[in-house]
């Protein structure tokens, strides 16, 4: 019996185009002036120390770090530091109503239904926890944060690593066979399945013919009774 559902964001609850055509360009355009202006702020300074450690350049100056971060964005690298800085920049965008967090039309209602049924809901995304809370807190369906019991990002590991799902299960104190992971990416679902989780693949376009996971097009097509131990 499923006790908790953990969902991905990009391509799952949210159109990938919102992330790549709205969020990423917004942060890219503002990254350089933001870091030059705020490099001495405590939270930013700490992140830059982490970045220097990540690239093994303890004496790198701010211009070098800016270049590195732009390179990370070009590669779509899942750098914890980059994701944290992007999240801080996006916060301004949400607060100024420059954009709203996109969720697919059926997602909010289905999450609310599961929550009302007593299921625990969590998010696991490569975006920082702060960015996750912003997207759902300022979504085009309103504030969805009260529906979630917790959030996970790359601090628990990469989404294609089995160990990340083992850590999440341990932190939640829930047996893997009582957990359901929702994602659009087959390789992430493979990792969750190897950790003992149930899985369901969200396919908003063409079916993934190489996937062995159950596939649905919408959240309201997910039938929890089909996921049994």
Curated annotation (Swiss-Prot):
* Its EC number(s): 3.1.3.77
GO MF annotation, one: acireductone synthase activity
Q: Which residues cross the membrane?
A: none
Pfam family of this protein, just one? Hydrolase
- Name the pathway: Amino-acid biosynthesis; L-methionine biosynthesis via salvage pathway; L-methionine from S-methyl-5-thio-alpha-D-ribose 1-phosphate: step 3/6; Amino-acid biosynthesis; L-methionine biosynthesis via salvage pathway; L-methionine from S-methyl-5-thio-alpha-D-ribose 1-phosphate: step 4/6
Name the cofactor(s) required for activity, per the record.
Mg(2+)
CC cofactor note:
Binds 1 Mg(2+) ion per subunit.
Identify the CDD domains for this entry.
HAD_EP (cd01629)
Q: How does it assemble?
A: Monomer.
Role description: Bifunctional enzyme that catalyzes the enolization of 2,3-diketo-5-methylthiopentyl-1-phosphate (DK-MTP-1-P) into the intermediate 2-hydroxy-3-keto-5-methylthiopentenyl-1-phosphate (HK-MTPenyl-1-P), which is then dephosphorylated to form the acireductone 1,2-dihydroxy-3-keto-5-methylthiopentene (DHK-MTPene).
**Name of the molecule in the record:** Enolase-phosphatase E1
Q: Which organism is it from?
A: Yersinia pestis (strain Pestoides F)
